[in-house]
């Protein structure tokens, strides 16, 4: 079995092959996200504690958190699930994944060091890989350098050096996202003002429409009353003429 061990503090990662099955037997029957002492891996691993973060079986199927079995299952996966990347919007697919319990059928087991031991592991804890890119979001730059809201974030951006042969060295800085500038505040004020204007205009239009509707309803009511009165006059006139004719006979 191979062990893919990473140490987030230094940014290093190392793949080691374990020939003796007895050394990795401590990881058997353990679930993903379980913290295990790594003393059984060798003398140099004394005091180290690792967390099981995943793995792949001999056919390459990945372990999935929450699937409480040793074997393989076929699950209907969609966007947001691990072990699946949708190619189309709303696409779902039935994929084979391995359970989250470790056993001897794994080819690679992924481990993360959560506690460093007494000795250094060459290529893992003794060297540091610098991060290629710094934070881009304004709030994360503030968090990294412990800045207050009053401090100017633009002065603390991590710049990337671009050194080319025959050209003078220059640096490149990322565009800071979510940076609050006077222009952003002006845009926000304009948005709020436009929203207020729209609501005021909608209120005025609604009031005008209600007034016009009331006027039209009043006109229709008066017209209806006139028609009713006209019908009554005609019916009374007919009744009086028929009465006079009958009296003459």
Curated annotation (Swiss-Prot):
The record's keywords, sorted A to Z, are:
Cytoplasm, Nucleus, Phosphoprotein, Ribonucleoprotein, Ribosomal protein
Q: How is it modified after translation?
A: Ribosomal protein S6 is the major substrate of protein kinases in eukaryote ribosomes. The phosphorylation is stimulated by growth factors, tumor promoting agents, and mitogens. It is dephosphorylated at growth arrest.
Q: Where is the composition biased (Low complexity)?
A: 236-249
- Recorded GO MF terms: structural constituent of ribosome
Extract the ranges annotated as region (Disordered).
216-249
Q: Name one GO cellular component term.
A: cytosolic small ribosomal subunit
Q: Residue positions of the PTM Phosphoserine?
A: 235-236, 240, 244, 247
What residue spans carry the Basic and acidic residues bias annotation? 216-229
Any one biological process term the GO annotation gives: positive regulation of cell population proliferation
The record's listing under InterPro entries reads: Ribosomal_eS6, Ribosomal_eS6-like, Ribosomal_eS6_CS
Q: Where in the cell is it found?
A: Cytoplasm; Nucleus, Nucleolus
Q: Where is the signal peptide?
A: none
Q: What is stated as this protein's family in its record?
A: Belongs to the eukaryotic ribosomal protein eS6 family.
Q: What does this protein do?
A: Component of the 40S small ribosomal subunit. Plays an important role in controlling cell growth and proliferation through the selective translation of particular classes of mRNA. Part of the small subunit (SSU) processome, first precursor of the small eukaryotic ribosomal subunit.
Q: How does it assemble?
A: Component of the small ribosomal subunit. Part of the small subunit (SSU) processome, composed of more than 70 proteins and the RNA chaperone small nucleolar RNA (snoRNA) U3.
The name of this protein is Small ribosomal subunit protein eS6
Q: Which species does this protein come from? A: Gallus gallus
């Amino acid at each position: 079995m191979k062990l893919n061990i990473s140490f987030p503090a230094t940014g290093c990662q190392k793949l080691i092959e374990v020939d003796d099955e007895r050394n990795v037997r401590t990881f058997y029957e353990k679930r993903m996200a379980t913290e295990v002492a790594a003393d059984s891996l060798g003398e140099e691993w004394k005091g180290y504690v690792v967390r099981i973060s995943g793995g792949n079986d001999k056919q390459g199927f990945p372990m999935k958190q929450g699937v409480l079995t040793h074997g393989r299952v076929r699950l209907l996966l969609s966007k947001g699930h691990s072990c699946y990347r949708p190619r189309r919007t709303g696409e779902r697919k039935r994929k084979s994944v391995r359970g989250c319990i470790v056993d001897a059928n794994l080819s690679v087991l992924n481990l993360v060091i959560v506690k460093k031991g007494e000795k250094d592991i060459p290529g893992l804890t003794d060297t540091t890989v610098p991060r290629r890119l710094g934070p881009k979001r304004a709030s994360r730059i503030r968090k990294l350098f412990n800045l207050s809201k009053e401090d100017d974030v633009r002065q603390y951006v991590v710049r990337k050096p671009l050194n080319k042969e025959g050209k003078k060295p220059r640096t490149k800085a990322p565009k800071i996202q979510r940076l609050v500038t006077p222009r952003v505040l002006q845009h926000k004020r304009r948005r709020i003002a436009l929203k207020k204007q729209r609501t005021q205009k909608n209120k005025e239009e609604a009031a005008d429409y209600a007034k016009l509707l009331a006027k039209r309803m009043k006109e229709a009511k008066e017209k209806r009353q006139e028609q009713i009165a006209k019908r009554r006059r005609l019916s009374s006139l007919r009744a009086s003429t028929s009465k006079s004719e009958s009296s003459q006979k």
